Amino acid sequence: MSTECLKPQTGGPQSQSLSQGGQYGALASGTCLPPSTPVPWSLPRWRAYLAAAVLCYINLLNYMNWFIIPGVLLDVQKYFHISDSHAGLLQTVFISCLLVSAPVFGYLGDRYNRKAILSFGILLWSGAGLSSSFISYQYSWLFFLSRGFVGTGAASYSTIAPTVLGDLFVKDQRTCALAVFYIFIPVGSGLGYVLGSTVAELTGNWRWALRLMPCLDAMALALLILLVPDVPRGAAEKQGEVAVRAPRSSWCEDVRYLGRNWSFVFSTLGVTAIAFVTGALGFWAPKFLFEARVVHGLQLPCFQEQCHSQDSLIFGALTVATGIIGVMLGAEASRRYKKVNPRAEPLICASSLFATAPCLYLALILASRTLLASYVFLALGELLLSCNWAVVADILLSVVVPRCRGTAEALQITVAHVLGDAGSPYLTGLISSVLQAERPDSYLQHFLSLQHSFLCCAFAIVLGGGFFLLTALHLEKDQARARQPGKGTLDSKDIASRNTESQGLLSGTSTPTE
């Protein structure tokens, strides 16, 4: 920002009148006027709530796009003539592109217009989804590629949208907003299954499910452009103050800063443990429950290529119901407990994970004796796991400086997927296969092998609880640092030198350099 300095005027009534008038006297004396003060940034509450509602709606569509293909997976396999192993690659391609893209969007989201990046992501995933519905069966590789583009678009939204919410609200309002936002993860996942299978059944063509989603995406894009403001980073924490651009740092400086932020590091490891368990449960739990029914004599063994079972539907309904209740329960407990204990958030996460471990263990052990008890404890375990989603997002936003939150979200997503749900289904299946190789070939032994392989999830969830206890030890210190003006990824010397330079420019003087 530049200032203009006028030369002093001598003589004449005009110069005398100027010198008598305060500000005009400064002009007459030849001193520099400070630049005009920027208008403080503020946003009415109703605009913030409206923007949050739009972001929640888009999050619903985001996860519907994630799980619409699994809802019509059998039809996709028949159309493209692909086996189960190749069908599994659809999700692998999706997750891989999401993992590669998340750090890129995190970097861009910390430095450029987040609203434009979100719009690009919606256009990308809706365009890829629509175009995939017109691909001929001879070009199945194009269909796989399109799922990769959908994953890339989803990465932009999953990385940046929570940071926008974090800049719209603070404290209890932020916790409630994040709770509502993360409710749409299980709801969107379940609706993706329902929409895909229902539209395919009504129209007789699975591709119409992919053609319907872009209509909803177009509405979401219009709402985003019209109703969601371009919020300055850290705006909620500085409501009513002048929004000053912070010194820009490199991506390596951001990562180095996050690596020294122990609350972020330990909470990310805790989230990874949660992702490990949810990934294994989501993939193997329906089959485990199906084999439990076979052992109890309630279900005939599957001798056909397509097995008809209600276990997937029941498990999906449990996931949606427990997800909604769990997210709201965790957010409300965090909001109330924070009033008496500043370390409430990681302590709630740790206690819920420690309580999940025995529930999961009992659900596995009791499945061979009573299926009803297994369902009850499995539902309790999923409920306790869901209590963490909004709380861990609130932890991240409270311990990371605003200009680095996009990178933090991206790194947390990447680590949680790479070390969590990307490998846990394979590891669980590998342990089950190794155990089956050493046992007689029977339905009972198949069930017991999968049952024993699930025990690694109980261990992982206890480990995650320990990481959240470590988070509690550092939480207050990291929150205080994130609230301090000028703190961030740059070293203190760099910040001091840049502040000195800016003050020199404003005062019309320069600082000598060696």
UniProtKB/Swiss-Prot annotation:
Residues 497-514 have a biased composition (Polar residues). Its main location: membrane. It is found in: Membrane. It comes from the Eukaryota. CDD domains: MFS_spinster_like. One of its GO terms (biological process) is lipid transport. GO terms for molecular function: transmembrane transporter activity. SUPFAM superfamilies: MFS general substrate transporter. InterPro entries: MFS (IPR011701), MFS_dom (IPR020846), MFS_spinster-like (IPR044770), MFS_trans_sf (IPR036259). Signal peptide: none annotated. The chain crosses the membrane at residues 54-74, 88-108, 116-136, 149-169, 176-196, 212-232, 264-284, 313-333, 347-367, 376-396, 415-435, 453-473. Gene3D superfamilies: MFS general substrate transporter like domains (1.20.1250.20). Residues 9-21 have a biased composition (Low complexity). GO terms for cellular component: membrane. The keyword Transferase does not apply. Keywords: Lipid transport, Membrane, Transmembrane, Transmembrane helix, Transport. It is a multi-pass membrane protein. Belongs to the major facilitator superfamily. Spinster (TC 2.A.1.49) family. Sphingolipid transporter. PANTHER family: PROTEIN SPINSTER HOMOLOG 3, SPINSTER. This is Protein spinster homolog 3. It comes from Mus musculus. The lineage of its organism: Eukaryota, Metazoa, Chordata, Craniata, Vertebrata. The gene is Spns3.
